[in-house]
């Protein structure tokens, strides 16, 4: 009888991936990125461990949504004070803080536990095409096909 192998934290090889969000659909990009962050693309995936990779998302301000969502989709936040609810449309939030849209979409697809919070720290989202992680030599993650190129 074979035993299930559980990877030790030292044996997990973490890579850096770069995703260009320009002209990508928000939900489709978020599912692929969440899968890579979680480690589901690796053969040693373990549900209760952080086996995922780092992901850098650039051009967050150029992400697209389908239909009328740019005018109708609402983002809510609350200050914690009575009457402190703030509501903002996708278009308004995209012009103000485009990184928050991508982060919120991906965070909602991660586990809502301590593990999910740990996985979320490996996501880096930037407005524009510049990022400070070039020293990590990220591989380009193509979302339309399942290929990874350098």
Curated annotation (Swiss-Prot):
Keywords: Ribonucleoprotein, Ribosomal protein
GO terms of biological process kind: negative regulation of translation; translation
Gene3D superfamilies for this protein: Ribosomal protein L13 (3.90.1180.10)
Residue ranges of the region described as Disordered: 128-150
Any one GO molecular function term: structural constituent of ribosome
CC terms in the record's Gene Ontology section: cytosolic large ribosomal subunit
Transmembrane segments: none
Subunit structure: Part of the 50S ribosomal subunit.
Task performed by this protein: This protein is one of the early assembly proteins of the 50S ribosomal subunit, although it is not seen to bind rRNA by itself. It is important during the early stages of 50S assembly.
PANTHER family the UniProt entry points to: LARGE RIBOSOMAL SUBUNIT PROTEIN UL13M, RIBOSOMAL PROTEIN L13
Family of the protein in this entry: Belongs to the universal ribosomal protein uL13 family.
Name of the protein in its database record: Large ribosomal subunit protein uL13
Organism: Prochlorococcus marinus (strain NATL2A)
């Amino acid at each position: 009888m074979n035993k299930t192998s559980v990877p030790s934290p030292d044996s997990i090889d973490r890579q850096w991936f770069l995703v260009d969000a320009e002209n990508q659909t928000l939900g489709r990009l978020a599912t692929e990125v969440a899968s890579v962050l979680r480690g589901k693309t690796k053969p040693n995936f373990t549900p209760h461990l952080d086996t995922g990779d780092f992901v850098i998302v650039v051009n967050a301000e150029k992400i697209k949504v389908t239909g009328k969502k740019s005018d109708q989709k609402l983002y809510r936040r609350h200050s914690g004070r009575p009457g402190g609810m703030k509501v903002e449309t996708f278009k308004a939030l995209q012009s103000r803080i485009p990184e928050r849209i991508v982060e919120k979409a991906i965070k909602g697809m991660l586990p809502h536990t301590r593990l999910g919070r740990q996985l979320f720290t490996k996501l880096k989202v930037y407005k524009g095409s510049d990022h400070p992680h070039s020293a990590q030599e990220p591989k380009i993650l193509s979302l339309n096909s399942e290929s990874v190129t350098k």
